[in-house]
């Protein structure tokens, strides 16, 4: 296919136009007074949402260069969500601001390499400062506050705090559709491990890139599956009884993965091959615990020659399995309580005799996973649209809360970023560059610093604007307030953010800044954009 090439300022401006279109659609959702966006879908019902990553994924622009720009910022939003579980809107706002300021500087003659260095160095200074100001969370009340802020609902905040109290801060919490309009919480037997589908062609939910199996049979293999012949009787048995089949193994030969994926796509069998991504003792432990919790064995050559005598009746069972990009969650495993308890007793006995820290930590982790189970939030709604929107909010809140438990919290509402931006005013920051670069280069590096400093103001400005208040007046007042004092968009008053429960997970904010800086740095150093020229039906080319 023929390609079109666009150079220099023209390329950057077109890419920037796409970034701005996507960012303008996403940033209206930020804050408690943020608005919804309705997404029209070709093959399904419209979706009303204020979830930044969902909006970003749906946007396709007609202009090919603008669409590339939109996709670049969309990737940053998705990446932020993958790492921190939330923060996509903040990442989008920061990326838009940094890119606009950066492109303006480069178009006006600044050296993009120097500006890029300034942006990257300044962002790292801010990330380090956020770590210093981060506050660990310990109480259920603090956990509830984080979840409530993320979801925009005190009721959801309470629900997630209850879930963490039931299964522990590092426990497994998942969501499911309720069959009523009410949203409820329950605990069940379950286990989670690092493992993902061996092929993306096995995915059933393209939007979330995950696959869900209801009432599956489960084959757990402690050895690599090399040929389809090894498991053919089990595949045929699963087809006969109508159950989906989950196969978990350390690895699969390419032939096996291809055959399974093709047959799944054809509808011959509902099967998912999951590669266990643990290694060494951790892999052995994960497979053993999975087998016991689902009522089967981790089959290997030591157990009578692999799968030679294994039938469908020997396989494990569970109520539900969710396979995502990095983890697999097995809910309601059908292993007998007596067998699981004996296994727990064995692990506890080993723990008492172990002195090595690695072994102790692994045993404690296994005991916790097997004994605490899984908390399931069953999401209800008056309509399918309402249920989907609520489920997205709960999943965002779960991710934010886990991030807060992991790395702590900072003042919310964009105030932490505004407060730390002042460290970039320090005149001594230039000293580290003086010995290695010219005065002209230094000036352009400091342009990058100024781009980051000004961009850190954008999230709080947008939250104020979305609340219906004049951002210029309120923002000017905030600049003179003490650190931690911000704008409560609900009450439209200035408050101590942390004391008022308006908080953000440190990990989310750091990741959003890191990804935004990466987008801006890439775009300002772009000199050429290349895209396909579409062909019309007559064979001549058209843009």
UniProtKB/Swiss-Prot annotation:
Residues engaged in binding ATP: 29-32, 86-90, 413, 504
BP-aspect Gene Ontology terms: protein refolding
Presence of keyword Isomerase: yes
Superkingdom field: Bacteria
Catalyzed reactions per annotation: ATP + H2O + a folded polypeptide = ADP + phosphate + an unfolded polypeptide
GO molecular function ontology, one term from the record: ATP binding
Gene3D superfamilies in the record: GroEL (3.50.7.10), GroEL-like equatorial domain (1.10.560.10), TCP-1-like chaperonin intermediate domain (3.30.260.10)
Top enzyme category: isomerase
Signal peptide positions (record): none
Keyword Hydrolase applies: no
Subunit-structure text: Forms a cylinder of 14 subunits composed of two heptameric rings stacked back-to-back. Interacts with the co-chaperonin GroES.
Family: Belongs to the chaperonin (HSP60) family.
PANTHER family: 60 KDA HEAT SHOCK PROTEIN, MITOCHONDRIAL (PTHR45633)
Listed NCBIfam families: GroEL, PRK00013.1, PRK12849.1, PRK12850.1, PRK12851.1
Protein name as it appears in the record: Chaperonin GroEL
Taxonomic source organism: Mycoplasma pneumoniae (strain ATCC 29342 / M129 / Subtype 1)
This protein's encoding gene: groEL
């Amino acid at each position: 296919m023929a390609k079109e090439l666009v150079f220099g300022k023209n390329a950057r401006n077109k890419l920037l136009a796409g970034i701005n279109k996507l960012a303008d659609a996403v940033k209206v959702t930020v804050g408690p007074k943020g608005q919804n966006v309705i997404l029209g879908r070709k093959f399904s019902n419209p979706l009303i949402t204020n979830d930044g990553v969902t909006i970003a994924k749906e946007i396709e622009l007609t202009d090919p260069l603008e669409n590339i720009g939109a996709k670049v910022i969309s990737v940053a939003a998705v990446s932020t969500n993958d790492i921190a579980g939330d923060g996509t809107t903040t990442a989008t706002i920061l990326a838009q601001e940094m890119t606009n300021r950066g492109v303006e500087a480069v178009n006006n003659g600044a050296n993009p390499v120097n500006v890029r260095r300034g942006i990257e160095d300044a962002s790292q200074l801010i990330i380090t400062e956020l770590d210093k100001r981060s506050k660990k969370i310990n109480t259920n009340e603090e956990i509830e506050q984080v979840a409530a802020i993320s979801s925009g609902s005190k009721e959801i905040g309470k629900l997630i705090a209850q879930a963490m109290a039931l299964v522990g801060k590092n426990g497994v919490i998942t969501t499911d559709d309720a069959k009523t309009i009410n949203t409820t919480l329950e605990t069940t037997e379950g286990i989670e491990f690092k493992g993902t589908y061996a092929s993306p062609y096995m995915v059933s939910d393209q939007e979330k890139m995950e696959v869900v199996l209801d009432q599956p049979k489960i084959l757990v293999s402690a050895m690599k599956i090399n040929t389809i012949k090894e498991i053919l009787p089990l595949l045929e048995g699963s087809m006969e009884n109508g159950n989906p089949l989950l196969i978990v193994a350390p690895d699969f030969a390419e032939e096996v993965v291809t055959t399974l994926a093709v047959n799944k796509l054809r509808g011959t069998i509902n099967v998912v091959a999951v590669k266990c991504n643990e290694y060494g003792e951790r892999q052995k432990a994960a497979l053993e615990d999975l087998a016991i919790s689902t009522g089967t064995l981790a089959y290997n050559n030591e157990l009578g020659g692999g799968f030679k005598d294994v039938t469908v009746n020997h396989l494990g069972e569970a109520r539900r399995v969710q396979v995502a990009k990095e983890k697999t969650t097995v809910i309601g495993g059908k292993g007998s309580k007596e067998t699981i308890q004996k296994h727990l007793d064995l692990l506890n006995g080993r723990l008492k005799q172990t002195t090595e820290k690695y072994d102790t930590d692994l045993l404690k982790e296994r005991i916790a996973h097997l004994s605490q189970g899984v908390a399931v939030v069953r999401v209800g709604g008056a309509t399918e649209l309402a249920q989907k929107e609520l489920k997205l909010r709960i999943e965002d809140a779960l991710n934010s809360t886990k991030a807060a438990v992991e790395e702590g919290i900072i003042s919310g509402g964009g105030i932490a970023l505004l407060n730390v931006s002042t460290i970039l005013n320090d005149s001594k920051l230039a000293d580290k560059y003086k010995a290695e670069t010219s005065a002209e280069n230094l000036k352009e590096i400091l342009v990058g610093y100024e781009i980051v400093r000004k961009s850190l103001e954008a999230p709080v400005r947008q939250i104020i604007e979305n609340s219906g208040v004049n951002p210029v007046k309120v923002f000017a007042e905030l600049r003179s307030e003490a650190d931690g004092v911000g704008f409560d968009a609900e009450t439209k008053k200035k408050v101590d953010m942390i004391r008022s429960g308006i908080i953000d997970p440190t990990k989310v904010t750091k990741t959003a800044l890191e990804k935004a800086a990466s987008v801006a740095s890439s775009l300002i150093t772009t000199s050429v954009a290349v895209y396909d020229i579409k062909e019309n039906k007559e064979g001549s080319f058209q843009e």
